């Protein structure tokens, strides 16, 4: 036995006589199975559950807890703190105990799709082969599910959702019971599944909030609420409403990909509380299917292969063309940022309505959707930003060596917002040098550019200019640029706006202007001492927070040895997994040569790779599925000679490390937010109410216009509601409603919704204005159930 922090952890390996640590404290890469019929794998880290995994010790008396040791059950009673769940279309579902370094089987469900009426968790067929997820004691596999906290299981259906008789102890020999509480889903073919805990979630067995489940089906997306209500989003994009690759972000937003010939990523900012065929809040188009929205993602003519939520409201999207990393701007999704990564280039973050993204793996190529390819005059040197780094650097500019583009209306920004950003390194900036200029060859006032006249730099937009305070003449890489926003021109200086900015209202549109990089448009003032990288020009002005985030993400790429590309030359992404505990994104790829099958990123930097063929008798390098959690990774190869491999962290003792802190907010309040365009009344908060229950609800609601304080409001709402058995939710007493707003038509109010079993907060903004709403809600109730998390 090993004791750490007064807790004892089981060990299957005896320490040697010399007192050295057992294998339990050492890194290990182990084969789980050699089967190539594994359809899905999932690492379930119970420390990420709402109670930090404490529910595992409260299950005494449930049918599964004290099962005897057998071929389908280990001798250990409690659910593992860290579990590996493997769904095999031939052998069923196996849960492995990763608290034990020997990785023993903990429980087996041996049901397949043909056993739907006698066994839980079918592991084959479209009904069960679509996605695997676990949260708060629930394991979800396609349409099928089991709940270890309430000791029950069932399946979803378009017309007859069912629950099984008996408990999980009867999993391999049960019968169908009556209908479950859940409504009908959109289609019985399930392609993926995900779950989250929303604000105000009902409390279920063992004090755990009940997850809200999202199912991506062949007929759209179904959102299954804890109450049993199911709402379907069936929006058709160019004749297709099939969905796959679904996930929730940290704020309750829901994202999924279309599955047909035209490929799109769709996003709902707020939970679905009504069946709808209307367009969601945001559609992210791919480069192969250009539409009217931005930013764009890398895509192919085949469906998006994998997607994963990353920190905050960001997400990763993989396709046959590579990887896209998105930082969503929840105030205005059209102003989100995206990076494109493949085996040739890393574009850096492209903001909103991007018009050019170059000097990334090529002197002339434009990595943006606009394809504004540059021309090279003379010879511009291509190198790397630092020794053994992968990011490209471009230098050797002179009067006869430069990059350019003929007039293009994409850069005629008029008097509106726009931005230019890139990275520069100077050995000496003495004398005047143009890093970039867009103007006529003879020179006009309708121009924009960036000029160094010594250690500092100057930015131009029309007739206005602003001088930086940043010293770029120090031999280091710096992020610089210009931003015009809200009628002011600013310098960009290593992740920050310049100190004050200057008024800027003149036009930069010019029907004869050309773009030169590395010199002025008349051929003078060449940037002979500069190296440039990651040039981006956009019709969108990034916010100060976005600039800071982009700087922090890109800066590591300019260090010696920094890697930032995918390993596979064919760029195809098979699977994605993000580990919140380590902030690492793992990309599984199709591999055509002897290179690692998985590339691992921290932000934009590649920090590790994994080669399954090095550790097992795999016949190839491709990895088809991946899951990560708690520092543990599992890789699966489903072709040729393959199988599933587990990569354990160097410090085991996972049962100790994986009992996490409670995720329940300590302020006792529910928190909601939404960004809404226009004056349409919209519900932004959903507070469940049970029958035979009275509740006192107090809410502070704030509103601010996105990008400034033009429109703003504050409301304080206090009311008492009740719902009798079999009755409607009714207002008992409106105690007070206080409000202050810049426009009288703005509204925030409570609204009871009996069919949904909830009190909602309805807000109304201002026509043509993007308003960001936030609500902090306190609920006091007398009930058999508590809903506060």
Which residues does each PLM region occupy?
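Extracellular glycan-recognition modules
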Residues: 400-458, 489, 526, 540-547, ...
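Surface-exposed ligand/attachment interfaces on beta-rich extracellular proteins
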Residues: 199, 407-410, 660-694, 702-713, ...
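Short, low-complexity N-terminal tether/leader segments at secretion or assembly junctions of large
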Residues: 1-25
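Extracellular glycan-interaction surfaces
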Residues: 372-400, 420-430, 446-506, 522
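Extended recognition patches within non-cytosolic domains
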Residues: 22-25, 230-231, 271-295, 326-370, ...
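Extracellular glycan-interaction patches encoded by glycine-rich segments
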Residues: 460-467, 510-533
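Structural signature of eukaryotic scaffold interfaces centered on beta-propeller domains
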Residues: 28-80, 122-136, 182-209, 244-251, ...
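Extracellular beta-strand elements of beta-rich domains used
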Residues: 422, 480, 532-537, 543, ...
């Amino acid at each position: 036995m090993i004791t750490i922090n007064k807790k004892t952890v089981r060990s299957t390996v005896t320490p040697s006589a010399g007192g050295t640590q057992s294998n339990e404290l050492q890194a290990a890469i182990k084969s789980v199975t050699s089967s190539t019929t594994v359809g899905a794998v999932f690492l379930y880290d119970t420390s990420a559950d709402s109670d930090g995994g404490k529910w595992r010790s409260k299950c005494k008396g449930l049918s599964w807890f004290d099962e005897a040791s057998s071929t389908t059950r280990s001798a250990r009673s409690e659910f593992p703190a860290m579990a590996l769940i493997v769904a095999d279309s031939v052998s069923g579902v196996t849960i492995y105990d990763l608290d034990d370094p020997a990785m023993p089987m903990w429980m087996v469900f041996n049901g397949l799709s043909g056993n739907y009426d006698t066994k839980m968790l079918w592991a084959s067929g479209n009904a069960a082969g679509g996605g695997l997820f676990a949260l708060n004691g629930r394991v979800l596999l396609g349409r099928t599910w089991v709940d270890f906290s309430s000791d029950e299981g069932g399946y979803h259906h378009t017309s007859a959702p069912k629950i099984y008789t008996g408990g999980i102890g009867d999993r391999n020999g049960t019968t169908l019971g009556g209908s479950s509480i859940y409504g009908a889903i959109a289609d019985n073919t399930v392609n993926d599944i995900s779950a989250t805990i929303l604000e105000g979630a009902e409390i279920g067995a063992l004090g755990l909030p009940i997850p809200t489940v999202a199912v991506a089906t062949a007929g759209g997306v179904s959102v299954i609420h804890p109450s049993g209500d199911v709402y379907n989003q069936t929006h058709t994009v160019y004749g297709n409403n099939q969905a796959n690759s679904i996930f929730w972000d940290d704020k309750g937003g829901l994202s999924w990909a279309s599955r047909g010939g035209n490929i799109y990523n769709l996003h709902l900012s707020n939970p679905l509380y009504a069946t709808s065929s209307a367009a969601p809040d945001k559609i992210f188009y791919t480069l192969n299917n250009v539409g009217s929205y931005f930013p764009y993602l890398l895509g192919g003519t085949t469906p998006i292969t994998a997607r994963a939520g990353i920190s905050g409201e960001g997400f990763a999207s993989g396709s046959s063309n590579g990887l896209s990393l998105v930082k969503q701007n929840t105030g205005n999704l059209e102003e989100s940022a995206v990076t494109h990564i493949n085996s040739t280039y890393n574009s850096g973050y492209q903001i909103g309505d991007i018009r050019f993204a170059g000097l990334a793996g090529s002197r002339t190529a434009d990595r943006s959707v606009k394809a504004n390819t540059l021309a090279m005059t003379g010879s511009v040197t291509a190198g790397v930003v630092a020794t053994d780094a992968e990011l490209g650097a471009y230098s050797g500019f002179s009067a006869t060596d430069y990059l350019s583009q003929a007039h293009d209306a994409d850069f005629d920004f008029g008097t509106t917002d726009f931005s230019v950003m890139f990275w520069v390194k100077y050995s000496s900036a003495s004398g005047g040098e143009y890093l970039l200029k867009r103007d006529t060859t003879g020179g006009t006032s309708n121009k924009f550019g960036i000029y160094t006249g010594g250690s500092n730099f100057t930015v131009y937009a029309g007739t206005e200019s602003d001088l930086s305070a940043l010293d770029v003449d120090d031999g280091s890489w710096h992020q610089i640029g210009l931003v015009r926003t809200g009628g002011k021109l600013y310098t960009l200086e290593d992740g920050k706006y310049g100190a004050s900015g200057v008024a800027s209202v003149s036009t930069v549109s010019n029907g004869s202007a050309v773009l030169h990089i590395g010199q002025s448009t008349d051929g003078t003032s060449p940037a002979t001492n500069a190296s440039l990288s990651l040039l981006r020009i956009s019709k969108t002005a990034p916010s100060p927070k976005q600039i800071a985030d982009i700087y922090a993400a890109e800066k590591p790429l300019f260090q010696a040895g920094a890697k930032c590309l995918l390993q596979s030359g064919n760029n195809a992404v098979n699977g994605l997994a993000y580990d919140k505990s380590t902030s690492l994104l793992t990309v599984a790829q199709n591999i055509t040569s002897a290179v690692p099958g998985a590339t691992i990123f921290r932000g934009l930097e590649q920090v590790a790779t994994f080669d399954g063929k090095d550790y097992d008798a795999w016949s190839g390098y491709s990895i088809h599925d991946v899951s990560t959690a708690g520092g543990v990774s599992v890789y699966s190869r489903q072709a040729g000679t393959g199988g599933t491999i587990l990569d354990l962290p160097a410090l085991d003792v996972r049962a100790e490390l994986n009992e996490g802190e409670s995720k329940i907010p300590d302020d006792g309040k529910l928190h909601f937010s939404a960004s809404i365009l226009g004056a349409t009344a919209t519900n932004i908060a959903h507070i469940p109410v049970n029958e035979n229950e009275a509740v006192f609800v107090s809410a502070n609601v704030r509103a601010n216009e996105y990008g400034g304080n033009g429109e703003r409001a504050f409301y304080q709402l206090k009311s008492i509601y009740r719902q009798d058995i079999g009755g409607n939710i009714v207002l008992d007493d409106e105690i007070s409603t206080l409000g202050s707003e810049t426009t009288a038509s703005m509204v925030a109010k409570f609204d009871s919704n009996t069919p949904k079993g909830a009190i909602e907060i309805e807000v109304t903004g201002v026509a043509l204005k993007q308003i960001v709403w936030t609500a902090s809600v306190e609920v006091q109730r007398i009930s058999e159930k508590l809903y506060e998390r």
